[in-house]
Amino acid sequence: MYNMMETELKPPGPQQASGGGGGGGNATAAATGGNQKNSPDRVKRPMNAFMVWSRGQRRKMAQENPKMHNSEISKRLGAEWKLLSETEKRPFIDEAKRLRALHMKEHPDYKYRPRRKTKTLMKKDKYTLPGGLLAPGGNSMASGVGVGAGLGGGLNQRMDSYAHMNGWSNGSYSMMQEQLGYPQHPGLNAHGAAQMQPMHRYVVSALQYNSMTSSQTYMNGSPTYSMSYSQQGTPGMALGSMGSVVKSEASSSPPVVTSSSHSRAPCQAGDLRDMISMYLPGAEVPEPAAPSRLHMAQHYQSGPVPGTAKYGTLPLSHM
């Protein structure tokens, strides 16, 4: 087994040597390519006016500045060429025309075939986003992964850059950023749940209380049942009349309801006549009979009547 591993590990050495030889071959190929460029068999393009002018100027500038790079010399020569007037460019343009005519005469079958230069873009140049969203070298995510605070800071910076890129205002976007930033902290989830519990408790208690009052109103055969539907705009009156009936029952009731029954019972006398005359079967009876019905309703509300059914429910004889 170790022998097999040794035999498997040995070949990379010669391969590296062969790779170096391949590199040497590539170097030789490049050298041959350079030789082909400089070879007399290769037909060059005729020089244009700028090349005719820059041929002497380049040599002169290279002698004056021996440490200057060729690309910098080309930039300066191009800037100087643009500053020249047409009269100064004219002799070089004429010389370029003469060289072109001579080139066409010597090489009638010549056709310029430009070779496409493939520009290899770097990774960060390919995927860079506007506004500097990615840090140089792609280290923004790597620096923020270790610590949660660092990740939140990197996210906030990127969100700010997104906000400026999309044209959002700082005020409106900061609210959204705060909403997104709160759940990042692990301790805030339990705190948020603890804050949400009292609200749910209040809602459930209110629902239970409403269901209790509605069920008690439905079970009692009293004018409260008709009054709760006749006048929905006065919930205090309905609550007060219901409290008086619940007080007469044997079951326990909330103390708030009983206190409201004493405070709001006098307000009901004026409106009971209209409601009873509207919803009771004897509504067609003339007006003098209404006080008797009002007295009967108040008698039922005051206390339990002997001979009634279980739990103090009121009889329906007045119907």
UniProtKB/Swiss-Prot annotation:
Query: Which location does the Swiss-Prot or TrEMBL entry give for the cross-link Glycyl lysine isopeptide (Lys-Gly) (interchain with G-Cter in SUMO)?
Result: 247
Q: What induces it?
A: By SRRT.
Its predominant location is nucleus
PTM characteristics: Sumoylation inhibits binding on DNA and negatively regulates the FGF4 transactivation. Methylation at Lys-44 and Lys-119 is necessary for the regulation of SOX2 proteasomal degradation.
Tell me which InterPro entries the record gives. Answer: HMG_box_dom, HMG_box_dom_sf, SOX_fam, SRY-related_HMG-box_TF-like
Spell out which residues are annotated as carrying N6-methyllysine: 44, 119
Q: In which tissues is it expressed?
A: Expressed in the cochlea (at protein level). Expressed in the brain and retina. A very low level of expression is seen in the stomach and lung. Expressed in the kidney.
Q: Where is the composition biased (Low complexity)?
A: 248-263
Q: Where is this motif: 9aaTAD?
A: 274-282
One matching Pfam family is SOXp
* GO biological process per UniProt: adenohypophysis development; anatomical structure formation involved in morphogenesis; cell fate commitment; cell fate specification; cellular response to cadmium ion; cerebral cortex development; detection of mechanical stimulus involved in equilibrioception; detection of mechanical stimulus involved in sensory perception of sound
- Residues that the record marks as modified (Phosphoserine) are 253
Transcription among the record's keywords? Answer: yes
Q: State the DNA-binding region(s).
A: 43-111
Which keywords does UniProt give here?
A: Activator, Cytoplasm, Developmental protein, DNA-binding, Isopeptide bond, Methylation, Nucleus, Phosphoprotein, Transcription, Transcription regulation, Ubl conjugation
Instruction: Provide the GO MF annotations for this entry.
Output: chromatin binding; chromatin DNA binding; DNA binding; DNA-binding transcription factor activity; DNA-binding transcription factor activity, RNA polymerase II-specific; DNA-binding transcription factor binding; RNA polymerase II cis-regulatory region sequence-specific DNA binding; RNA polymerase II-specific DNA-binding transcription factor binding
- Is NAD given among the entry's keywords? no
Disrupted gene: phenotype observed: Embryonically lethal.
Q: Where is this region: Disordered?
A: 1-43, 247-267, 299-319
Q: Which GO terms describe its cellular component?
A: chromatin; cytoplasm; nucleoplasm; nucleus; transcription regulator complex
What practical uses are noted? POU5F1/OCT4, SOX2, MYC/c-Myc and KLF4 are the four Yamanaka factors. When combined, these factors are sufficient to reprogram differentiated cells to an embryonic-like state designated iPS (induced pluripotent stem) cells. iPS cells exhibit the morphology and growth properties of ES cells and express ES cell marker genes.
Can you tell which superkingdom this protein's organism belongs to?
Eukaryota
So what does this one do?
A: Transcription factor that forms a trimeric complex with POU5F1 (OCT3/4) on DNA and controls the expression of a number of genes involved in embryonic development such as YES1, FGF4, UTF1 and ZFP206. Binds to the proximal enhancer region of NANOG. Critical for early embryogenesis and for embryonic stem cell pluripotency. Downstream SRRT target that mediates the promotion of neural stem cell self-renewal. Keeps neural cells undifferentiated by counteracting the activity of proneural proteins and suppresses neuronal differentiation. May function as a switch in neuronal development.
What does the record's free text say on domains? The 9aaTAD motif is a transactivation domain present in a large number of yeast and animal transcription factors.
Q: What is this protein called?
A: Transcription factor SOX-2
Which species is listed as the source? Mus musculus (Mouse)
User: What is the phylogenetic placement of the source species in the record?
Assistant: Eukaryota, Metazoa, Chordata, Craniata, Vertebrata
